[in-house]
Amino acid sequence: MRRISVVPASIFSTTIRTLFVSAMALTASASLTSLFPLHADVLYLNEGEEHIGNIEKIGDGKIGFNEADGTKHTYVATETAHVLFSKIRPGDEISQVASITDPLVREILAKAPTAAQHPDSDYVTLFRRRTFTFRPDGSVLHERRKLLKILKEPGLDEANQSIFYAFDREKPDLVFAHTYGADGRVTHLTDDALSDEAIFSSTPEYDRLKKLKFALKKVDIGSVIDVLQRIETIPPTPLRPYVIDATFGQREPVLADEIVIEAPKNLALCIKTYQWTGNAPRMTDTVNASGNRVISWFFSDPKGYIPEQNMSSRSRIFPRLVITPETSWNDAAKAFKESLDKAAPSPERLDAFLTEAGIASGSQMMKAQRIYEAILKKIRLVDLSCFDYGGYDAPSADVVLKKRYASTFARTVLLYHALRRIGLPVDFGFAASWREGGIKREIPSLGQAEDALLRVSIDGETIYVTCDSDYLPFGHIAPAFQGTAAAFLEGDTFTFAITPEGDAVKNRVDQQVFVKLAANGSVDVRDVRCFRGPFETGIRGIKAAKTAEKRISAENTVKRVHPKARLIDFAYSNLDDLEAPVVLTLSYHIPDAALTASDKLMAMKNLWVNFESGSASLASRTYPMDCFVTSETTTTVVIELPDSYDWVPWNRTFSYACSFLDFGASLTQNGRTLLFADRFRVSRKTFQPADAYPQYRACVSAMADLDNQWIVLEKADVQATATPAQKKMTASETSHTDSPGNR
């Protein structure tokens, strides 16, 4: 689920985070600091009570303790569990909800809804304010305050939170984290519930991201949690940009949600809104007493939304706000070009790698494929995006060749310089997933980009290449980047293009099944499955598995055909050959695959037609539906019939066709052979509720009808003497509990 991100987007936790320091909270902080140093002692009693303050004296079996409110108390040592030295935070001196003086919190708690008012919600966001203060030098103070109430057990997960940050240019601070219990007690976060973790410490070249984890204490159903966070940044650059990308609305109710931007009047901001219809946030634009421009957007959605299967990304459905300091694509292009040139490998090291890749002979296409495959096989992939890397400064290709591991971005930099070395025209590009809307030209910042890709010209053919999978052939880009808007460096600027969709050649699955049906209803099967494009990556990943593990995988595959299926043999094609499709060949036996009502009548399901209709189970939709990729699948089943048996024809067709969907199936008998064939093609990935989805559902319904049909066989002498009613007998009325639908 997409949430507000400030590029590098993943430096923030997957929960939306911005914070707000109220005047009352600041006052409380100042008064607390005057009473105690920055750190304080937390005294834990055996009964579970927590007391915050300072230890004055320990002796004679007693502990003298100064409470946070200034009172003094003496505790018996035997009633004390332990003492923790912890940072003292604003509000830590308050132990009871009745003692809270912050008017904001008092008002929110007084009006907090009950679980009965939101019976379908796990929690409700009572208040959230995200404040971004831009300073004259371009640095930003990003603050977030959030109060939410836990209504059901799944909502307890909200007690565990994280702050992601790029430690080389950002400084996080957890100002406070309080739990307001349903019993009126207030519990505070202490330093033992905090941990600061590096994410990519094992790969120091990419180790910019850290995570500050914390867990609020004593969170239970009915509790309200109140968290205040802050991240302070250094000034951004074209290759370390700052982008605010916020989508309003979430599954759980949001009673009050506000984004506030404060910036000098002379700082130009690029502000873009999307899906700004219906329940759009209300905007105000003023100038404060300091002369700074203050823009705020307020949003409320007391209902939340009910998610639908395969629904489009929130950022393409709900109101979306994107803000970045005004700059230009030319500035980004100039900075990145300098970075890309600087990252070039030394000629000696690059030539050694090209020799290692085996490009001494062959066409330019063959050389490009060998270089690409050498990078996939010899440069271990570090799975992190440009967001995780924390910027768009090109990683050194020399370091990649020396260390032999790299991110997708770094792999792409190496491939770029290698292809140029053999004389191929190549453009370096960046892309964002089509599900998130791709790169938007009207937002002049690389901060939108998730990862890198190349556009190569070979023998007059334009080929797009990504390096984010070890198993995709050269020219087969990842599904996320198929049909998306990408930005390519050309000369002194970035130009924009839509990457090609997958087609019936690159995204496809073909299955050929040869079945010998015995008179007792058992079958012997030879099942050949051919995968191309994104469907082959999972199969190729099994190449490193042991033979026993491969056999278990094959056994599981045939069990999905029929629970009684028994694997006889299996084989894979050469999984190291990326240019050839992946082929899996299975041989198996299924006893009782067909039902025998008598010695002259037999019926069986077409076990190799398996449609799942979950994606079209809704009669109507509120939100658009996305499918994985544009693709084509075909199935051919050849059944050798037992002696004297003939198929009882269906006398009906199963097909559906429109401009972006095509399904057809046929079943015919030729001699002793029954031949089934079907084909399903989809050339659109997003289906709007009012027009495209009804057509998608109609197509899936036709496929579901086919899935419900039984193949009925009769001996020839019975067929010859049967009554007209018997000849028309089919099992199409037979109920079947499987969920049919899209393959």
Which positions does each model-derived feature cover?
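Secretory-pathway-linked proteins and extracytosolic
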Residues: 78-79, 84-115, 220, 232-243, ...
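Cysteine-centered nucleophilic/redox motifs
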Residues: 146, 223-225, 259, 371, ...
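Early extracytoplasmic/domain-onset interaction patches
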Residues: 90-163, 501-529, 566
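Short, conserved helix/loop micro-motifs enriched in His/Cys and acidic residues
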Residues: 351, 380-404, 434
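Long hydrophobic segments that form regular secondary structure
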Residues: 491-593
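Hydrophobic/aromatic-rich core segments of domains that either
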Residues: 409-499
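A surface-exposed beta-strand-loop module
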Residues: 175-246, 283-318, 512-514, 565-600, ...
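Compositionally biased alpha-helical segments
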Residues: 35-128
